[in-house]
Swiss-Prot record:
Main subcellular location of this protein, as a coarse class: membrane
Top-level taxon of the source organism: Eukaryota
UniProt-listed Pfam families: IQ, Neuromodulin, Neuromodulin_N
Similarity section: Belongs to the neuromodulin family.
Membrane topology term: Peripheral membrane protein
Organism the protein comes from: Pongo abelii (Sumatran orangutan)
Cell compartments where the protein resides: Cell membrane; Cell projection, Growth cone membrane; Synapse; Cell projection, Filopodium membrane
Positions carrying Phosphothreonine: 181
Name of the gene: GAP43
Protein name: Neuromodulin
Post-translational modification: Phosphorylated. Phosphorylation of this protein by a protein kinase C is specifically correlated with certain forms of synaptic plasticity.
Domain IQ: 31-60
Lipidation (S-palmitoyl cysteine): 3-4
Length: 238
């Protein structure tokens, strides 16, 4: 029995040894390799994340730099355009006209001198004109202020002047109304007292009556106006 047991154990060991020999790797080595693979994969994952973040930062920095580079040439182009326009405007102003075939060689210099003199003459009157405009504006402002300051006193002076003509008009209207009413009443009385004997007299009486009727509303209107103006004058006096 013991011999059989020993033989079987040896056979099992031999089988394991054969497997190990065939594979060439022990189980411990397999476990160690598996652990190293896991660690390597984890490290690789971390490094990939870092690389992605760095790449994003690099991409953003590259975009910013590209935008700056694009803006730089645009600004330079704008400045160059502005300088080109200024130089182009200055060139025709300062440049002399081409000489005509019939003129002498000294004409360009004379033209330049004439242009310089004209420019100085234009600049000289412009300065006094601007000073005169400033002085005129200051005078107008002072005049407006003085008028605004004096406006209350002028209104106070105008008020009595307005009251006096109103007071003068009221008695005149009253006297005119008093003068017209007796004449109208006399004409009406005469027209009624005389008998209508003839057609001419009757027509005259009718005309007188019509004249009286026309004058009555006018007189009443004048009296009403006089009555309205009297309390206004009293109020103004008060």
């Amino acid at each position: 029995m013991l011999c059989c047991m020993r033989r079987t154990k040896q056979v099992e060991k031999n089988d394991d040894d054969q497997k190990i020999e065939q594979d060439g790797i022990k189980p411990e080595d397999k476990a160690h390799k598996a652990a190293t693979k896991i660690q390597a994969s984890f490290r690789g994952h971390i490094t990939r994340k870092k690389l992605k973040g760095e790449k994003k930062d690099d991409v953003q920095a590259a975009e910013v730099e590209a935008n700056k580079k694009d803006e730089g040439p645009v600004a330079d182009g704008v400045e160059k355009k502005g300088e080109g326009t200024t130089t182009a405007e200055a060139a025709p102003a300062t440049g002399s006209k081409p000489d005509e075939p019939g003129k002498a060689g000294e004409t360009p210099s004379e033209e330049k001198k004439g242009e310089g003199d004209a420019a100085t003459e234009q600049a000289a009157p412009q300065a006094p004109a601007s000073s005169e405009e400033k002085a005129g504006s200051a005078e107008t402002e002072s005049a407006t202020k003085a008028s605004t300051d004096n406006s209350p006193s002028s209104e106070a002076e105008d008020a009595p002047a307005k009251e006096e003509p109103k007071q003068a008009d009221v008695p005149a209207a009253v006297t005119a109304a008093a003068a017209t009413t007796p004449a109208a009443e006399d004409a009406a009385a005469k027209a009624t007292a005389q008998p209508p004997t003839e057609t001419g007299e009757s027509s005259q009486a009718e005309e007188n009556i019509e004249a009286v009727d026309e004058t009555k509303p006018k007189e009443s209107a004048r009296q009403d106006e006089g009555k309205e103006e009297e309390p206004e004058a009293d109020r103004e006096h008060a």
